């Protein structure tokens, strides 16, 4: 398989069409989409050669667009920086304005998978901007802050928005972030699990500060999308829920 390469610098995405999960409703399997040639339609795969942040060149076999969504202040930018750079953004909180993105290439079972990860603004005034970016997303990580009950209560509103603007087969995962702040926790783990079960979503708790489950969340999504786009007929189906439960349990000893 010949690998594509892209120079790293900032870029933009192109919108497309939609639908999604309902409480206790079945969700169809997503056939993940790899990058294809420059003649692909605007609502189709990401394009090879699309610029990304940083210097140097990324070599990859397939690429997918992953969006982080949720209320302002839930830690989307910190989670992304932790995964991309292995660092924690401590200090003054600065809200994302509009939308931004970073790229990272993972080795998934011998396949170079490029994740183009979009960090969205959670404030209401930027919603019309972020709506357009839902449409060609292959996966969405929906975050709430375990120390902020309102951000958890708003998850259903986010799911309604996703249902309206995202593709019906988008890969979706629910993340309860900031579990390092145990003394400030107001949303129990069981509440997150219950909501995720109601909507049929994989779920885990994360910490951008300690790194708990951050790599796991993105790796699980990369595995799911890679298999959707490249699964051989004889290859067993990758089960995202089972993988998250199995691998997440190994990190339980580190939970605050």
From Swiss-Prot:
Localization terms from the record: Golgi apparatus membrane; Cytoplasmic vesicle, Secretory vesicle membrane
Topological relation to the membrane, as annotated: Lipid-anchor
First-listed, main subcellular location of the protein, grouped into a coarse class: Golgi
Known catalytic reactions: GTP + H2O = GDP + phosphate + H(+)
Outcome of mutating residue 123 to L: Constitutively activated
Keyword Metal-binding part of the UniProt annotation: yes
Gene3D superfamilies: P-loop containing nucleotide triphosphate hydrolases
Residues that, per the record, bind Mg(2+): 77, 96, 119
EC number: 3.6.5.2
Activation and inhibition: Regulated by guanine nucleotide exchange factors (GEFs) which promote the exchange of bound GDP for free GTP. Regulated by GTPase activating proteins (GAPs) which increase the GTP hydrolysis activity. Inhibited by GDP dissociation inhibitors (GDIs).
Region described as Disordered: 1-51
Expressing tissues: Predominantly expressed in brain.
Effect of residue 177 to I: Inactive, due to loss of GNP binding. Abolishes location at Golgi membranes. Impairs transport of ADRA2A and ADRA2B from the Golgi to the cell membrane
Keywords: Cytoplasmic vesicle, Golgi apparatus, GTP-binding, Hydrolase, Lipoprotein, Magnesium, Membrane, Metal-binding, Nucleotide-binding, Prenylation, Protein transport, Transport
UniProt biased composition (Low complexity): 12-23
Domain notes per entry: Switch 1, switch 2 and the interswitch regions are characteristic of Rab GTPases and mediate the interactions with Rab downstream effectors. The switch regions undergo conformational changes upon nucleotide binding which drive interaction with specific sets of effector proteins, with most effectors only binding to GTP-bound Rab.
Assembly mode: Interacts with RIMS1. Interacts with ADRA2B.
Family to which this protein belongs: Belongs to the small GTPase superfamily. Rab family.
Cited function: The small GTPases Rab are key regulators of intracellular membrane trafficking, from the formation of transport vesicles to their fusion with membranes. Rabs cycle between an inactive GDP-bound form and an active GTP-bound form that is able to recruit to membranes different set of downstream effectors directly responsible for vesicle formation, movement, tethering and fusion. RAB26 mediates transport of ADRA2A and ADRA2B from the Golgi to the cell membrane. Plays a role in the maturation of zymogenic granules and in pepsinogen secretion in the stomach.
The protein, known as: Ras-related protein Rab-26
